[in-house]
């Protein structure tokens, strides 16, 4: 307990306005990104970013003050050192324990793998459930219904869900007349590899959860970290926009646009529903 208090006191001394509130939260929100194009888009949401360095931590954080509801809100952001779940898990855990955000947000880019006629570049994907499709066992091709050449795969998916309070806020935006973003709410698959082959989607994802709307490499870690950390726990949200469709047409062409709509939707949530 003494060590925890020392950490919070140190952060409060370093960053005025970061003193824990009565519920124990040290800042309003923390936004995590995985790649530079996502971080660049988040940097445009607020003015006056300042760099924050935590003693003993190589990660660079940035802080901005944001006026909303007649109060000053503090937003922290950081970009992962690397793509993937391991890096996302570590960064999410460090942010939670160092800054104690009320909201833990990940925005950025993802693949759309829902109904093709219903999804467009730049559409926002908000997962109500995220499952790790990469967990399982590699076996002989005759030992599983999922096979790639001579290799079979027996999936053992694990999942995490969005908090009902956060989902309620998201669902309000879906039906709101002033929401300019096209939002898809549904399951998202998360795995360890970039996918540019529709056979992977069909055999390893839609064969298990046919209504899965999106695919990425980090989202599972965000909901998992928020669910399993010590209190006060943040409310977690993943809001990523479609930049490709996990097939042979995959390219970087729409990444900036997708990053823009993703961060824009997060700002819309802040302005109208969360702050």
Annotate each PLM feature.
Residues 2-275:
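Intrinsic-disorder/coil detector with helix-boundary
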């Amino acid at each position: 307990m003494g060590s925890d208090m020392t950490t919070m006191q140190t952060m409060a001394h370093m960053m005025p306005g970061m003193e824990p509130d009565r519920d124990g939260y040290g800042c309003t929100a923390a936004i995590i990104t995985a790649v530079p194009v996502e971080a660049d888009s988040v940097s445009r949401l607020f003015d006056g970013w300042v760099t924050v360095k935590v003693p003993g931590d190589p990660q660079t954080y940035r802080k901005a003050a944001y006026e909303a509801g007649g109060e000053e809100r503090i937003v922290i952001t950081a970009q992962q050192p690397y793509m993937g779940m391991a890096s996302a898990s570590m960064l999410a855990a460090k942010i939670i324990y160092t800054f104690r955000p009320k909201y833990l947000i990940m925005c950025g880019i993802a693949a759309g793998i829902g109904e093709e006629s219903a999804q467009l570049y730049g559409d926002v994907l908000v997962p109500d459930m995220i499952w790790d499709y990469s967990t399982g066992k590699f076996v002989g091709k005759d030992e599983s219904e999922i096979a790639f050449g001579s290799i079979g795969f027996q999936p053992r998916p694990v999942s995490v869900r969005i908090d009902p309070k956060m989902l309620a806020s998201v669902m309000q935006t879906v039906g709101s007349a002033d929401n300019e973003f096209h939002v898809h709410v549904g399951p998202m698959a998360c795995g360890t590899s970039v996918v540019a082959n529709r056979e992977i989607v069909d055999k390893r994802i839609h064969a298990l959860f046919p209504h899965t709307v999106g695919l990425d490499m980090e989202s599972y870690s965000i909901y998992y970290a928020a669910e399993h950390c010590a209190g006060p726990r943040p409310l977690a949200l993943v809001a990523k926009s479609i930049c490709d469709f996990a097939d042979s047409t995959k390219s970087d062409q729409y990444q900036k646009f997708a990053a823009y709509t993703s961060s824009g939707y997060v700002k819309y949530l802040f302005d109208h529903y969360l702050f």
